[in-house]
Amino acid sequence: MSVPTVVNIAKKETLLPYKYQYAICTFVTNWDEYGRMLDSFIAAGFTTDDCEYRYADNTNGNSFDAYQGINQFLQNADAKYIIICHQDILLKFDKRADLDRRLAELEALDSNWAVAGNAGTNNPYLLSMKITHSDMVTHKVGVLPSKVNSLDENFLLVKKSANLALSGDLSGFHMYGTDICLIASCLGYNTYAIEFSLQHLSMGRLDASFYALSKKLQTKYARFFRGRYIKTTVTRFYLSPNRLVRAVMDISFIQSIVRLYYKCSYKWFKKY
């Protein structure tokens, strides 16, 4: 087949510019609350000239859970940066120009970042955040920006080019800030808490659904990060965070024993 014929059939892949700089995506259960949030964003400089606003309508029941809806946002938004935020936040302090500057600083610090937020943690005891709640008390702790492994869900910002998605085997309205950070890390990206000061009108609820989903997320990732053999069509190796375990399990003699075990197990199950 000639080159001209191929060109007529196939489409050459190119990097297309995004239509918008920011997409602001929200789950809506209360139109008045969402309207106040939207007005505060526009007043802060997120105008429709180069920003799009998307919402998932949950005013008549949960048409979307967070994982399903956010995956829709991440797939459909045509913006360089995708903001996923609660409907009960107000941009009373920092503005669009502040966020532009913070992201430029973050890009200079680490161009391999994929997710940012205003509150997160990078170990069991150290928080990094700046946020004001409905009592107008500003809570600022830790160092910003700071690399984290989990982010609060009130305000998340995702770099579209990272091509992230949330887990397909989790559902509900909690822990997706942790899930997206873990997935970004698995894909080779970093996640950060940055300084972007806003007002969050609620403190969140740690109800039974929170603890149930937290348990599901723990179970999912405990299984995902388990030690195990990986067999390709041309090689095999053992995955483990422990270097010594990897070295032992990759010894040819050990692999031979494991291979014999699986072969015998397969024959036994096939027989019965």
Residue spans for each PLM region:
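Conserved donor NDP-sugar-binding/catalytic core segment of glycosyltransferases
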Residues: N60, D94-I131
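N-proximal low-complexity "stem/linker" segments adjacent to membrane-targeting elements
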Residues: M1-A43, R54
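Short, flexible, basic/aromatic active-site loop/helix in glycosyltransferases
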Residues: M129-N149, E153, N163
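Glycine-rich, basic loop-to-helix element that forms the pyrophosphate-binding segment
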Residues: G61-A77
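The conserved acidic donor/metal-binding loop of glycosyltransferases
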Residues: H86-L90
